[in-house]
């Protein structure tokens, strides 16, 4: 019922804008026909999401919303987590990475695998042993109440900001390909999309997401594979010929061993990949919440190792698409985009006037990737605020109000980011991650690697000072040597936090 009500309102809005933009319809009938085809595909996709929501939301309680009653099949969690972790940023930005760094990103993906193994066999056993709903409750038990609150607030800031960056992708893509020609303002586009998320997650929460993420992952990779096939066909290649062309292309270089200064050096990329997973998965409530819904610890470990390994071939597909797109641009005598983020959208714009399928698949892939990230982020933010900040895990009415409030704040963050963003989307995510996730890494590392009692009163100040000091070091080194920290910013930030905690607890032991 929710879906059909929304569909009626949506179509009325579209009809209203069509009436207001009568001249646009007359002059651009074919583009609008394409737009309506995209809208039909997206509405059909959301009809499936709402069907899953209706099924999983029956007799849902707070325990269902937060932990899916600890009954999720591990293989469904693993499959869904691939799509949830990839996001719309990957769909747009990773193919374009070949323009500036070839296939060097696969070095980071190799580090991801080791990172997931560490999380599966070090952190997951701890979380299951303590039977946690929120992983930041560990900080309260090990370090103290202020440490608990500090970790929770840093996650709220980090996740809200990072998720807004990711969801910004789907908003600008749909605005560009669908809503802008109809005269719909960006703000309304954003509100409509976030409203959809709220509607299909408001009852079942994380239980709904385990199943909808699997559907979204399936749609994402179906769209990706068909687009790859479409580009190869445009190049008059069979799939075998396309594979050979990609593997022999100058942009297919993976490893950088010889340049220690370069940000693309193998060991910098590999170690950054390990720490990115430790932070963005191991101490991230959003990523861990689904893993904590598995029936057993062994099931959770199997799911994490499975999707950890899957990241390498998944990103290889995206990068291979990037190489094929470069070949397509060159074959058609077109200038390559100045920004890698425009590589795939540019291809879609060039071909979608002839093939509606291209634009439909592109939008479907973007929507599937971005919604699987945003919906789980909003669920985890609601969980943290209710369970950790307010300490009212069982208050169902509070949880419902908080979920709606988080959606409203999410919209504001997206609109703010649209105004201030001026960097590559994929780099923006890791810049934000480096400055806001670093203290989380330091807090968990201190709790796990030492037995010393922290000075809990000073923890909030240390956590705030660490990113500021990290930024000062990055700026100072850049001014003096020209070197800028890359993904290793995570490690530096975590190390500064760890050192601050250690010095503040000098002479105190458990």
Can you say where each PLM-predicted feature lies in the sequence?
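Short, Lys/Arg-enriched N-terminal segments with co-localized hydrophobic residues
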Residues: 20-35
């Amino acid at each position: 019922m929710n879906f059909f009500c929304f569909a009626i309102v949506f179509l009325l809005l579209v009809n209203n804008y069509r009436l207001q933009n009568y001249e646009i319809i007359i002059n651009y009938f074919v583009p609008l026909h394409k737009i309506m085809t995209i809208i039909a595909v997206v509405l059909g996709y959301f009809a499936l999401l709402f069907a899953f929501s209706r099924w999983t939301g029956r007799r849902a309680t707070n325990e269902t919303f937060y932990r899916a009653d600890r009954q999720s099949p591990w293989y469904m969690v693993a499959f869904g987590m691939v799509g949830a972790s990839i996001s719309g940023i990957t769909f747009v930005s990773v193919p374009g990475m070949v323009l500036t760094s070839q296939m060097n990103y696969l070095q980071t993906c190799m580090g991801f695998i080791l990172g997931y193994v560490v999380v599966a066999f070090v952190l997951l056993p701890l979380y299951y042993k303590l039977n946690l709903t929120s992983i930041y409750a560990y900080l309260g038990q090990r370090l103290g109440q202020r440490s608990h609150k500090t970790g929770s607030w840093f996650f709220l800031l980090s996740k809200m900001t990072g998720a807004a960056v990711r969801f910004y992708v789907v908003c600008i893509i749909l605005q560009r390909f669908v809503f802008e020609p109809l005269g719909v303002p960006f703000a309304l586009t954003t509100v409509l999309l976030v409203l959809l998320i709220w509607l299909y997650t408001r009852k079942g929460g994380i239980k709904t997401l385990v199943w909808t993420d699997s559907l979204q992952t399936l749609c994402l990779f179906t769209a990706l594979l068909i687009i790859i096939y479409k580009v190869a066909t445009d190049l008059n290649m069979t799939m075998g010929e396309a594979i050979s062309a990609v593997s022999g292309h100058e942009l297919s270089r993976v490893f950088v061993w010889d340049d220690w200064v370069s940000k693309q050096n193998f060991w910098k990329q590999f170690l950054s990949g390990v720490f990115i997973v430790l932070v963005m998965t191991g101490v991230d409530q959003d990523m861990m919440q689904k893993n904590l819904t598995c029936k057993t610890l062994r099931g959770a470990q199997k799911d994490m190792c499975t999707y950890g390994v899957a990241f390498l071939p998944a990103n290889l597909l995206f990068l291979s698409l990037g190489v094929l797109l470069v070949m397509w641009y060159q074959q058609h005598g077109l200038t390559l985009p100045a920004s890698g983020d425009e590589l795939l959208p540019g291809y879609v714009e060039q071909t979608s006037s002839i093939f509606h399928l291209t634009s439909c698949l592109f939008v479907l892939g973007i929507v599937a990737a971005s919604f699987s990230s945003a919906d789980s982020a909003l669920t985890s933010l609601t969980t943290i605020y209710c369970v950790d900040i307010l300490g009212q895990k069982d208050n169902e009415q509070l949880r419902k109000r908080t979920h709606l409030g988080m959606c409203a704040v999410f919209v504001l963050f997206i609109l703010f980011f649209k105004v201030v963003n001026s960097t590559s989307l994929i780099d923006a995510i890791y810049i934000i991650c480096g400055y806001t996730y670093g203290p989380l890494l330091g807090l968990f590392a201190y709790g796990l690697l030492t037995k010393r009692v922290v000075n809990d009163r000073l923890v909030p100040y240390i956590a705030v000072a660490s990113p500021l000091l990290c930024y000062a070091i990055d700026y100072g080194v850049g001014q003096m040597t020209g070197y800028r920290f890359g993904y290793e910013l995570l490690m530096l930030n975590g190390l500064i936090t760890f050192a601050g905690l250690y010095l503040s607890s000098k002479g105190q032991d458990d």
